[in-house]
Amino acid sequence: VRHRYVTDLIVSSDSVGNGHFSDYHRFFSHAVWSIDHLWKCLAILIVKTLISKDATIVLAGDDTLCRKRGLGIFGTGMHHDALSSSKNKKICHWGHDWVDLCIVIANPWWAPTKVFALPICMRLYRNRQGLTKGKGKSGKKTTASQRKAASKKAKKAAKAKRKAAASARAVHKVDNTPRKTRPELMAEMVALVASWFPDRRFVLVVDSLYSGESVLSTLPDNFDLIGPVHAKAALYAPAPPETKKRRGPRRKQGDRLKSVGAWEKDGTRWKTFHFDQYGLHGSLRVKTRTGLYYKAGKDRLLRFVLSQDTVGGRPTRIFYSTDVNLNPQKILSIFSLRWAIEVTHFDCKQHLGLEDPANRVPKAV
C-alpha cells in the first residue's frame, strides 16, 4: 500500500483520538479477511437501503486497468488501455486488470438526474505476460563467446527463477489453477451475486466482451442480460415446428437471419424514439425481431433490436435482451445506464486512489 495510506484513512474518516493509531495498522495487517463476505455485506446494505423490495435490480459489468510500475507487484501484466487507445491505434499498459460488477442506482430521490454504479464484487484478471517487461531485443551483433556466456547466465537465472517460484508457492500458497478469462470471471461473479439474492430479479448490462457464450450460457434463472451482438455474429430464426417424422435429432435453429447491413436496408419499417436521459441523448431509429444467438446462447429465444442514430453520431448496432417481453425503447434505456460504471472507474482512480496500492503479496492484492 502507498506510503501513509492507513494514516490517511484514519484522518479522512475523522477517527483521530478514537484509539491508538497502531490499532488501525494491526487491524489491516493481521486480521483475517474474506473479501467476498465483505462484498456480500455491502451488497445487502445497498439493496436494503436504496432499492425497493419489488424492483428489478440493474447490474453493470465491465473491467478497468489500474496502471502500475515494476515487476515486483503481484498479478500485473500488459493489458489493453482503453483510455489511451484510439480507433486507429491500440495501446497496452502495465498494471492490474480488474473485472467488476456494480449495482446501478438510477435517479434516486436525492439526485433525480444522476445515475450511480456502486461496486459489489471484483476479480483480478491475470494473463501470461507478467514476466516480459523490459526484455527488448538488442540491435547489436553478439560473438560466439558472448552468446555462450549469455546462455549460461540464462540457465542459471531460470534455475533461480524456478526455485523462487517454488518458494513463493510454499510461502504464499499461490493458486495454480488454470487462469480464467475475463468473461469467465464475470460469470463467476454473476453466479455469486445470484446466490446472495435468490428471491430477487436482476438485469445485467454489459459491453460486447461479456455478452458472449461464457456469460449468456451460464446465466442464472433470476438474471436477464442486455448487451450488444458482435458485428459478424450469425443470428438464426427459431426452429420451425416438426410437421412430419424424419430421421435424426430435431432441429435446434431455423434459417439464418439477415446481417446488420441487410437488415438495415430491407423493407421493414423503422420506429423512431427520442431519448433524453443519463447516458443517452438524441433520436434513434429501431427495428426489432426475435431469434437465436446460437453460438452464445444456443436455443434460448432473444429479443434483437437494431439501433440507428438519426444524426449519425453512433454506429448502427444490434442489441439483444433475454427478456423477450421488453420493448426496444426499454432495452436501449436500460443499456444506456451502463455508462455509470465508466464514471465510477474514473472517480475511484482520481479521488479514492484505486491505482495507488503496490503490493507484492497475493493476499494483499
Summary of predicted features, one role per range:
Residues 1-3, 324-325:
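Short acidic alpha-helix initiation/capping motifs at coil-to-helix transition points
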Residues 29-145, 289-290:
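Active-site-proximal, Lys/Arg-enriched surface segment
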